[in-house]
Regions:
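Short glycine/proline-enriched turns and hinge-like loops at secondary-structure junctions
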Residues: 91-94, 135-137
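Short, conserved beta-strand element in jelly-roll/cupin
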Residues: 93-109
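Conserved hydrophobic/aromatic beta-strand scaffold that supports enzyme active sites
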Residues: 70, 78-80, 100-101, 122-124, ...
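Short, conserved glycine- and acidic-residue-centered signature motifs
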Residues: 93, 236, 288
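Short hydrophobic/aromatic patch on the recognition helix
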Residues: 271, 275, 323-324, 328
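Conserved short histidine dyad/triad with adjacent acidic residue
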Residues: 61-68, 72, 76-93
């Protein structure tokens, strides 16, 4: 792995593959870890999830096989865990975190905090909550643990919601099929994309974009769908103009929708409606266009990070390489590799 250390450990009961960037690295390189674990020992499976204090007890007879795929960076931990036997799980996530989970597949109904859980449910633990989870055979779940204070601040500043009040003391949510499927797809997309391109996580901009994506996804899946307050047209024009000024003043940075909401003091929905009415485009597409142009500028003026399409894209917050290539070609009519190749060819010709 480029710029990372890789360790492969094999044991009779577990195979663990981990990759990480050391905490001591500075500059634009950010610490992260990626782990894949296959266990045939239930205690080792319980201990595999980084930062959690767990006890697993096998409840059905037969050889246990469990798997874990985990990403951790900044204040975000994203994982997918599978087990073939029924298990009772108890314990706590890492201190100060809000954890949510969405089942992908199960042979029968699970129980979380004593409540029945199927694939149409989302489960959650707050910072002071303890895990009490009975999982059936053939269980497959996506989990996300994120700093609770950061989540509450994001919900308050960007979404204008009190997410702590939304969660309350509830441990099981039924968000509805559409919202839950969207949340599930979002988490799976991140895991699968970074499995193919884990070095994208070494860039702080990528981590920042992913963190805000995860924060927004959690708020969206559990928050009630309340109507956004009406904003007068002149106010919307001012919001859009101010947003554009802010983006242009920080053209070298990866600005996100959350940054705009905080800077302008408006909710995500107000920003969305304002851009749609004034420009006929949503702020996400507008920001993506600005970032694509930023990547193209780097290709045209190559520095150390322009040595590869993958690294340059990741430095601008494009963590999904396939989506980036598609968006880039749609925007500029050529592949990013073609732009970079043209630039290198021109530099060679211009050389005396």
């Amino acid at each position: 792995m480029d710029g990372c250390t890789a360790v492969l450990m094999d044991a009779a009961s577990a195979a663990t593959e981990t990759s990480a960037v050391p905490e001591a690295w500075g500059g634009d390189v950010a610490p992260f870890s990626v782990a894949r674990v296959t266990s045939t020992d239930i205690e080792e499976q319980a201990a595999s999830l980084n930062g959690w204090n767990q006890v697993y007890e096998q409840m059905t007879p037969g050889r246990f096989v469990g798997k874990l795929h985990e990403l951790r960076f900044s204040g975000v931990q994203l994982f997918r865990e599978t087990s073939n036997q029924a298990v009772h799980e108890s314990g706590t996530p890492w201190a100060g975190s809000r954890a949510v989970g969405v089942p992908i597949e199960m042979d029968s109904t699970a129980r979380f905090g004593g409540q029945p859980v199927d694939t149409d449910a989302l489960v959650t633990l707050g910072p002071a909550d303890e895990l009490d989870f009975y999982t059936p055979r053939g269980f497959d779940i996506l989990g996300l643990a994120i700093d609770a204070d950061v989540l509450e601040a994001h919900a308050r500043q960007v979404e204008h919601r009190d997410i702590a009040a939304v969660f309350g003391t509830r441990c099981v949510f039924k968000p509805g099929t559409v919202r839950l499927n969207e949340f599930r797809r979002s988490l799976l997309s991140v895991l699968q994309s970074l499995d193919a391109n884990p070095t994208a996580l070494q860039f702080r901009q990528t981590q920042r974009v992913l963190e805000q994506t995860m924060l927004g996804a959690v708020v969206a899946v559990v928050a009630d769908e309340a109507a956004a307050p009406e904003v007068a047209n002149p106010r919307r024009r001012h919001i859009v103009d101010s947003a554009k000024d802010f983006m242009r003043s920080r053209i070298a940075e990866t600005i996100t929708v959350a940054d705009l909401c905080i800077e302008l003091g408006v909710s995500r929905r107000t920003l969305q409606y304002s851009f749609q009415e004034v420009l006929g485009i949503n702020p996400i597409r507008f920001l993506r266009a600005m970032r694509l142009n930023g990547v193209r500028r780097d290709f045209k003026n190559p520095g150390p990070l322009a040595s590869s399409v993958q690294d340059t894209a990741a430095n601008w917050g494009f963590w999904h390489l396939g989506h980036f290539v598609t968006d880039y070609k749609r925007m500029f009519g050529e592949l990013p590799s073609e732009t970079l190749r043209h630039t290198r060819r021109s530099a060679t010709v211009a050389r005396p």
